[in-house]
C-alpha cells in the first residue's frame, strides 16, 4: 500500500524542538535544511505509485524519504550499511528526510529495502527526472546566471572485471550455459561434454601461454559459433539476454569463412579490427572502451561558473555514455538539453575535441559562443601570407601559439 507524506505541510509543533535552539540553528544552517525545504518534496515519488496497490497490502516505507535516502547515500559516498545506520541514528539525515516519528517502522530501513529502491530508481530511469527537478529547484533558489558555462567529460570505471579476449569468451559462454541450465535443463543436458569444459573447476584449461592464445581463441570461437547455431531456432532461448550477448560476442570477435567442401570455418578477427563499442564484459554490456582512458563509461558534465567566488556553481547537464563515444558528438546535445531547462549559456568553455568547425557553427546558430583550443596540428598549418592579412582562424592560431610557446628561461 502506498505511503507518502505531504512534505510541504508544516507540523503544528516542531518535531525537532527538543534539540534546543543551538542544535536547531546548526541543522538550519546545514545542507540538511536545504534538502528538506527545497528538494525533498520535488522528488518524483508519484512515478513509483504504479508499482504498488493504493489500498491493499502492507504500507511501503515513506516513498519521498526512500528516494531521498538513495540520493543522500550517493551524495555522502556511504556504503549501504553506513546509509542504513545514518537513516536510523543520524539526526541530520532524519531532519533532511523529514522523519518525525521515532518508531522502527518510520526510522529504520533494511538492506533489502535500500537495494530494492536503488534498483527501482535505475530500472524506472528516475535519475533523469530527479536531476531535472533538483536542478530547476536550485537554479530558482540561487538565481544563478547561466550565461557562462563549461563542458568536459570524466571517465567512470565500471564495477566489472577487465577481461582479456580469452576470459571474455569463457565468461560469456559460461554465463549463457548457467542460464540455460536454470531455465532449459534438458537442452543443457543434451550439450554433453561441452558443459564440463566451461565448469569453473576447468578454469586451468584456459590459462594458456601467450604462444598458445591464438589457438585457444579459435577453439572458443568454434564453441561460441556452435552454441549460436544450435539454438538460433529456439525462440525462448533466443530471447535470453545471455544468448544475445553470445551472438554479439561472435559477431564482434569472429568471422565465418568458407572452408574445404563448402564447410564453415571460424576465424578470429585481429585485435585492431575490434570496435571500441564491442562487448567488454557480459556483466555490463553497456560499457565501452577508450584507448586513452580504458574500459567503462564517460560522463558529460556542463556547469555554470563565475568570477565571483561567492556564487555557487550549478551542474546544468549530465549524460552518461559508453567510454568509446567521442566528445565531439556531445556539445550540441548538451546545449539543447540546457535550453530545454531554460539554463542555456551564451558563452561555453570546452576542450579541443568539442571545438570542431561544425560544432562551433551549430552552437552559434543556437546563440552560444564556444571557446575551445585549436588542435596543435591545425595551428601549425596556419600560415600568414602577410603581416597585414588576417583570415578566419588567425586569432585562434595566435592564442594557441601563446599557449604552446615555451616560457622564457629568464
Where are these regions (language model features)?
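Short, low-complexity, charge-dense intrinsically disordered segments
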Residues: 392-402
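Basic, short loop/linker segments at the boundary and entry of helix-turn-helix/winged-helix-like folds
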Residues: 28-68
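Polybasic low-complexity intrinsically disordered regions
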Residues: 58, 85-88, 107-347, 352, ...
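Helix-centered, glycine/charged polyanion-binding patches within enzymatic domains
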Residues: 361-390, 410
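Charged, often Cys/His-bearing segments associated with DNA-binding zinc-finger transcription factors
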Residues: 1-39
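Basic polycationic patches enriched in arginine
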Residues: 387, 402-405
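Short, positively charged loop/turn segments that connect secondary-structure elements
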Residues: 92-113
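Alpha-helical support elements that line or immediately flank enzyme active sites
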Residues: 67-77
Amino acid at each position: 500500500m502506498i505511503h507518502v507524506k505531504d512534505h510541504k505541510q508544516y507540523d503544528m509543533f516542531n518535531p525537532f524542538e527538543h534539540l534546543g535552539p543551538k542544535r536547531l540553528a546548526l541543522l538550519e544552517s546545514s545542507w540538511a535544511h536545504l534538502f528538506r525545504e527545497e528538494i525533498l518534496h520535488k522528488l518524483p515519488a508519484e512515478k513509483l505509485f504504479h508499482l504498488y496497490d493504493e489500498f491493499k497490502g502492507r504500507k511501503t516505507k515513506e516513498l519521498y524519504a526512500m528516494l531521498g535516502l538513495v540520493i543522500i547515500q550517493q551524495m555522502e559516498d556511504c556504503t549501504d550499511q553506513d546509509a542504513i545506520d545514518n537513516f536510523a541514528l543520524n539526526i541530520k539525515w532524519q531532519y533532511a528526510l523529514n522523519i518525525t516519528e521515532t518508531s522502527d517502522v518510520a526510522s529504520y530501513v533494511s538492506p533489502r529495502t535500500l537495494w530494492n529502491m536503488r534498483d527501482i530508481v535505475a530500472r524506472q530511469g528516475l535519475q533523469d527526472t530527479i536531476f531535472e527537478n533538483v536542478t530547476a529547484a536550485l537554479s530558482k533558489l540561487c538565481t544563478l546566471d547561466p550565461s557562462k558555462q563549461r563542458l568536459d567529460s570524466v571517465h567512470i570505471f565500471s564495477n566489472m572485471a577487465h577481461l582479456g579476449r580469452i576470459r571474455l569468451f569463457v565468461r560469456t559462454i559460461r554465463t549463457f550455459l548457467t542460464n540455460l541450465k536454470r531455465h532449459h535443463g534438458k537442452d543443457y543436458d543434451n550439450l554433453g561434454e561441452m558443459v564440463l569444459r566451461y565448469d569453473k573447476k576447468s578454469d586451468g584449461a584456459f590459462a594458456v601461454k601467450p604462444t598458445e592464445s591464438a589457438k585457444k581463441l579459435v577453439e572458443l570461437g568454434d564453441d561460441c559459433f556452435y552454441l549460436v547455431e544450435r539454438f538460433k531456432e529456439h525462440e525462448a532461448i533466443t530471447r535470453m539476454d545471455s544468448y544475445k550477448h553470445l551472438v554479439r560476442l561472435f559477431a564482434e570477435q569472429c568471422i565465418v569463412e568458407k572452408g574445404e567442401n563448402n564447410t564453415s570455418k571460424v576465424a578470429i578477427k585481429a585485435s585492431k579490427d575490434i570496435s571500441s563499442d564491442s562487448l567488454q564484459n557480459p556483466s555490463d554490456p553497456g560499457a565501452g572502451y577508450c584507448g586513452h582512458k580504458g574500459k567503462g563509461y564517460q560522463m558529460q558534465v556542463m556547469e555554470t561558473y563565475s568570477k565571483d567566488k561567492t556564487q555557487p556553481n550549478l551542474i546544468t547537464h549530465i549524460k552518461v555514455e559508453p567510454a568509446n563515444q567521442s566528445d565531439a558528438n556531445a556539445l550540441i546535445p548538451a546545449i539543447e538539453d540546457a535550453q530545454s531547462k531554460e539554463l542555456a549559456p551564451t558563452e561555453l568553455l570546452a576542450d579541443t575535441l568539442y571545438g570542431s568547425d561544425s560544432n562551433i557553427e551549430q552552437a552559434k546558430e543556437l546563440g552560444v559562443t564556444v571557446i575551445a583550443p585549436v588542435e596543435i596540428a591545425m595551428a601549425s598549418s596556419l600560415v600568414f601570407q602577410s603581416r597585414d592579412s588576417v583570415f578566419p582562424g588567425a586569432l585562434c592560431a595566435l592564442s594557441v601559439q601563446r599557449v604552446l610557446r615555451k616560457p622564457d628561461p629568464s
